[in-house]
Structures are given as C-alpha cells and as structure tokens.
C-alpha cells in the first residue's frame, strides 16, 4: 500500500533565482499574451509563449521551465488535460502549474492537479504574487507579510 507521503510530488530545487525564472505560458490570444508578457517581464521573469497544450507539453520536457501558466481554452490539448499530463509524468510533475480562465473552473483546475487558479481578467499584482509564491513558498508573501 502506498502511503500519502509516497504520493507527494518531489519539489524541484530552483536553480534559477525566481526573478529570472523561465515561465512557459500557454495562451493563443495575442492581446492577452502582450498583457501577460508585460506583467511578467516587468517583474523580471523570462517568458516563453506557445499556442496550444501539445506544444507546451513538448517544451516542458525540453526546457524544464520553472513554472507553467495555461489558459483552459487552448487548441489541441486543453489546459486541464495539459495539467493532468504534466502531473502524471515523472520528469514534469514537479513543475508548478497555474491555470487561468474566464470560466468559473477552480475546482476542475485543482482536480486536474493545478497548483493555483487565477480568474480572468488577470491582475498584475495577483499574477506576479502567485508566480513568486509558487517558485519560493518559503519567502514571505507580499500580500500578507507571512510565509
């Protein structure tokens, strides 16, 4: 029998300081890409965009990003299916995944294995804070001042 402790995903050590971490972002809308790029570049992150979940799955294995952000409604492999596949694959299961959508889908995102869910429209401070918190959970949260 497998204990709950044995099922926990291993935490990948951060090789890149969080401010220069590579973020793989799955978004097809060019206007939203521009907004996300501005928010994340402004915070000091390196961002790589892809159009669909299948591309993201392939690049996640090749690039080993620090975090993956995905919209639910993307072509091919949707964001929830992408999340499930990432979390089921040993070499990618430790990568934090943030799912975002205009849909009220937080429960479905969590069930798919998402580490966080953000409702669109995205707010810069919330997006950046969630990314920072997932990259280094021991840092004090800017929102609360607490770890």
Segments predicted by a language model, with ranges:
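A short, hydrophobic beta-strand element within the central beta-sheet of small alpha/beta folds
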Residues: 93-104
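Charged docking surfaces used in two-component/phosphorelay signaling
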Residues: 34-42
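Non-catalytic signal-transmission and effector/linker regions of two-component phosphorelay proteins
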Residues: 1-24, 28, 125-147
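The feature encodes the CheY-like receiver
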Residues: 33, 74-75
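Short hydrophobic/Thr-rich beta-strand motif most characteristic of the beta2 strand and flanking loop
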Residues: 44-51, 59
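Active-site residues of response regulator receiver
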Residues: 71
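Alpha4 helix (beta4-alpha4-beta5 surface) of REC/receiver domains from two-component response regulators
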Residues: 37, 81, 102-119, 125-129, ...
